[in-house]
């Protein structure tokens, strides 16, 4: 009976954590809009119809900042892994984890190539690729500083606190081993909603979950997530065709050492030589 109660409590907590994301995102976005109305002395109803779309990353960055404060508070109060708590960046091994992050980007690139070349005849994949392309193009419509804050800085912190810091540990309390790695990874994938993103985000989530299971370091998986997003959204001066081609090629090549490093982490529990 106690196991059933613990299971339902974990499921309820996970539901609350996920619901909080959408609630806080809405509140944060609304507060930002009201602030804009106050500064410009414009009634909310008179804001341009495309105001949210044209300022999406600026609004999302503010909402993410609010959300991460709440998640950080919950994470601290929960005191997960109290007796085996390792929450520091393993500085000597940072280059190796950075290489794993690059390999994660390589897997994403390979999946998108496969989806585009092989699966694009499937309607849902074709539509999803088009939507994904539109999302990518929207990155050109705002100042890079807001994209940086939303996609590279605050976004990864929020998502890692949510999926590795909170959800992973809730599942781990019920069932250890591969269960929290896989389930938190799949939820991370579904969280991204767009079908082509769901696939590679699930794979990335499972890899990040595996790294977290071995290191118990939230800052480490935040770093890996940030690096992955940074390489995917380079600043305009670096977003040249030749540079992007080189980066994509390096990411794909990095898949090989990534597999080796993950195997080493699996066998030894550390990447330290």
Stretches found by the model and what they are:
Residues 42-53, 84-155, 173, 242:
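Juxtamembrane helix-loop-helix connectors linking adjacent transmembrane helices
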């Amino acid at each position: 009976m106690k196991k059933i109660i613990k299971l339902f409590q974990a499921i309820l907590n996970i539901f609350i954590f996920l619901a909080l994301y959408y609630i806080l995102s809405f509140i944060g976005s609304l507060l930002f809009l009201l602030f804009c109305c106050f500064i410009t002395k414009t009634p909310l109803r008179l804001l341009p119809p495309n105001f949210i779309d044209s300022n999406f990353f600026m609004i999302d960055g503010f909402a993410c900042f609010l959300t991460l404060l709440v998640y950080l508070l919950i994470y601290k109060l929960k005191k997960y892994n109290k007796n085996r708590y390792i929450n520091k960046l393993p500085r000597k091994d940072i280059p190796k984890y950075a290489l794993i992050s690059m390999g994660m980007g390589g897997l994403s690139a390979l999946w998108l190539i496969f989806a585009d070349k092989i699966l694009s005849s499937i309607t849902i994949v074709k539509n999803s690729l088009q939507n994904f392309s539109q999302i990518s193009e929207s990155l050109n419509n705002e100042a890079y500083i807001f994209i940086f804050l939303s996609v590279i800085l605050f976004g990864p912190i929020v998502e890692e606190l949510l999926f590795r810091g909170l959800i992973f540990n809730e599942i781990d309390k019920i069932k250890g081993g591969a269960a929290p790695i896989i389930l938190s990874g799949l939820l991370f994938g579904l969280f991204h909603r767009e079908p082509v993103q769901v696939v590679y985000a699930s794979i990335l989530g499972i890899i990040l979950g595996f790294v977290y299971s071995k290191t118990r370091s939230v800052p480490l998986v935040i770093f890996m997530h940030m690096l992955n997003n940074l390489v995917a959204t380079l600043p305009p001066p670096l977003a040249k065709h030749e540079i992007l081609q080189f980066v994509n090629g390096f990411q794909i090549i990095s898949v090989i050492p990534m597999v080796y490093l993950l195997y080493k982490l699996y066998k030894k529990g550390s990447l330290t030589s």
